[in-house]
Amino acid sequence: MKIKYRSYNLRFKHPFTISRGTKTHQPTLIVELEHFGIKGYGEAPAISYYDLPVEKMIEDLETKKAFIEKFSFTDPERFWHYCHHLFPKNSFLVCALDIAGWDLFGKMKRKKLYELWGLDISKNPMTDFTIGIDAVDVMVDKMKETPWPIYKIKLGTEHDVEIITELRKHTSSVIRIDANAAWKADEALEKINAFKHLGVELIEQPLAKDDWEGMKFLFKRSPLPL
């Protein structure tokens, strides 16, 4: 088996802002596995707060590249297990290799992944389209640019309720909210009570990941699923 890789800095169509900051590009690693002339592709993004940049993925991959190329590829699950032990501290790289392994296996068997897994895609849940924090008129324009049945709206500002109030005027689609840990418990409850009357379906990551007491408080009182 042969392996190739390439790094990209993918430019977003629009700047993407959440409560932690703004991104205009996404650093990404693409890997290619080739086995008897058939190629499979996988990718992994670099997310800053996980401290695993693309450069680290490449460095780790280079140190064990020969082991991957010597692997006798017959089963993607076995390949994942092998990669998991090769790179125990780099789950993003393992993910890219795992995706490439499944893509390769599907092409070898001439089957789509859902066929390999025995899935009925007619029952797939609908994914949401994410809109980052911006001036509210820009957020409205993004909704109009991409009509969608479910929107995830990034929040974490002093004007969160006003933003959702305005967006609701322009769509009847389901709205989900992701605060990316921007709120405190009391603030979150106040906002969630307002969102309940604006047709919001659920709230994602309202509080800091280690605020267990706040989550306990909010879970008992929130009128919306968390």
Regions found by a protein language model. Name each.
Residues 31, 37, 97, 110, ...:
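Conserved, mostly hydrophobic/aromatic
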Residues 33-34, 39-108:
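Metal- or metallocofactor-binding catalytic centers and their adjacent structured scaffolds
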Residues 123-135, 154, 180-184:
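Active-site mouth loops of central-metabolism enzymes
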Residues 132-146, 158, 186-190:
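Short, acidic/polar
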